[in-house]
Amino acid sequence: MDRKVAREFRHKVDFLIENDAEKDYLYDVLRMYHQTMDVAVLVGDLKLVINEPSRLPLFDAIRPLIPLKHQVEYDQLTPRRSRKLKEVRLDRLHPEGLGLSVRGGLEFGCGLFISHLIKDGQADSVGLQVGDEIVRINGYSISSCTHEEVINLIRTKKTVSIKVRHIGLIPVKSSPDEPLKWQYVDQFVSESGGGRSSLGSPGSQENKEKKVFISLVGSRGLGCSISSGPIQKPGIFISHVKPGSLSAEVGLETGDQIVEVNGIDFSNLDHKEAVNVLKSSRSLTISIVAGAGRELFMTDQERLAEVRQRELQRQELLMQKRLAMESNKILQEQQEMERQRKKEIAQKAAEENERYRKEMEQIVEEEEKFRKQWEEDWGSKEQLRSPKTITAEVHPIPLRKPKYDLGVDPEFDPADDLDGGTNKRGEQDFRKYEEGFDPYSMFTPEQIMGKDVRLLRVKKEGALDLALEGGVDSPIGKVVVSAVYEGGAAERHGGIVKGDEIMAINGKIVTDYTLAEAEAALQKAWNQGDWIDLVVAVCPPKEYDDELTFF
């Protein structure tokens, strides 16, 4: 082995693998491969330590250590990572859906991977593969998205644009407490219950056709012998390969079936014709099926060992499949539990909303009943009361500070009379509000609940001079105006009075704000722009007696 290659390889191993035991295992596997020269076993053993996407570059680093004759087989057995992104477009409204299942997300500590494809479905038809990592959806990177956020992003458009790169691994996490693990696509049992055997052990590799190119110029011959197969297995097979020969160099082995040479089909040729074709040219393009007739040239001991080996492999594969299916079963149970939990949460929320609606209806009914009772009890008495007894003066609202803030009794002008007080109230009830405002565009019917909701635009001239009280955490349960001071922008506007509920400030709903949060939002809005928009629920007009003091 070239020292520079070995040094670079060790450096990459140290960089990608921190665990010393795993490093030792990797070097032991490579030493055993150079003794047995079994590529399939090597790749199967490597997959046990190259078990996450960040370690996949090790396959490329190991490739220079593989003899030339085994590199084609090595490339076939190792996952083919794609560095380039592939973009496809899927119709979200297709009757059969997108045709894929995905795993992963930010909450699992990994990206989003395709774990299952419906055969001949949309995703399968456009060339997506199990083990593809989804990088972008509709132009947005999903590297910091949870699983649910990605699903919601897919639902935003009719045509879904997906960019993927092939990794060849799938994330597996059976429970929240279990660390994240990865499985190769050929080892993964999909949600449909099917699975494919791993290519990582001998005997599991399917017979695959491959081509070799041989130039006989300057050589003594191929260095192999051929023979015809029996009646039950016709064809031309390689019966012997001379060590160190040209055939051995290109990877031909005993038991390989020759299916074509220089475009001539060997399936119906007899032994003599096959020999003539092989000797007819100094440049040969040979198509073979590796190992197709290996059992024809095995000894009894080799056959017995092969049977034992296959049985061990079968048991191992069955165990892997059972483990994979059990993992999927646990995942499906967890998904069902999560769906049930969300369903219960939604049901409780609906029940809570219904209970709140009934309570509010009951409160409204009780308030209406109380109002009617009050009118019945006091309305008739007011009609019988002599006008001469109403000799009290009107107590006006303090012009600069509310009564409880001044700490002194307000002064009354003896010239004020009952009619003057009535005019004062009439001016106060005048509201300047924006017409055409639809409160249902901002609030739910439960939030409005019969209120007279208006949009006011207050020009910023001087100070607002508006005091608030209450808040969602107070007995009042809402933010209301406690005072409107004379000379302020609110008083000059004329559309805000004490008792009005503040529902929104500059488009921001404050029905669930505390007093401190509402005051901060009001101050922030007042410091921005030339106007401030306030959405208020108008305080119901007070009874006339509330504005009078009797002596």
Swiss-Prot record:
Region (Mediates interaction with MYO7B): 194-532
Region (Disordered): 401-425
Any coiled-coil regions, as ranges: 318-377
Record key words, sorted: Cell projection, Coiled coil, Cytoplasm, Cytoskeleton, Differentiation, Hearing, Phosphoprotein, Repeat
Major subcellular location class: cytoplasm
PDZ domain: residues covered: 87-169, 211-293, 452-536
Gene Ontology biological process terms, A to Z: auditory receptor cell morphogenesis; brush border assembly; inner ear receptor cell stereocilium organization; protein localization to microvillus; regulation of microvillus length; retinal cone cell development; sensory perception of sound
A GO-annotated cellular component: brush border
Location within or outside the cell: Cytoplasm, Cytosol; Cytoplasm, Cytoskeleton; Cell projection, Microvillus
Pfam families from the UniProt entry: PDZ, USH1C_N
Residues with Phosphoserine modification: S219
Acidic residues biased stretches: 408-419
Gene3D superfamilies: 1.20.1160.20, 2.30.42.10
Chain spans, region N-terminal domain: 1-86
Domain notes: The PDZ 1 domain mediates interaction with ANKS4B, USHBP1, USH1G, SLC4A7.
Subunit structure: Part of the IMAC/intermicrovillar adhesion complex/intermicrovillar tip-link complex composed of ANKS4B, MYO7B, USH1C, CDHR2 and CDHR5. Part of a complex composed of USH1C, USH1G and MYO7A. Interacts with F-actin. Interacts with USH2A. Interacts with SLC4A7. Interacts (via PDZ1 domain) with the C-terminus of USHBP1. Interacts (via N-terminus and PDZ 2 domain) with CDH23. Interacts with USH1G. Interacts with MYO7B. Interacts with CDHR2 and CDHR5; may mediate their interaction with MYO7B at the microvilli tip. Interacts (via PDZ 1 domain) with ANKS4B. Interacts (via PDZ 1 domain) with DOCK4.
Function: Anchoring/scaffolding protein that is a part of the functional network formed by USH1C, USH1G, CDH23 and MYO7A that mediates mechanotransduction in cochlear hair cells. Required for normal development and maintenance of cochlear hair cell bundles. As part of the intermicrovillar adhesion complex/IMAC plays a role in brush border differentiation, controlling microvilli organization and length. Probably plays a central regulatory role in the assembly of the complex, recruiting CDHR2, CDHR5 and MYO7B to the microvilli tips.
Protein name: Harmonin
Higher taxonomy: Eukaryota, Metazoa, Chordata, Craniata, Vertebrata
Gene name in the database record: USH1C
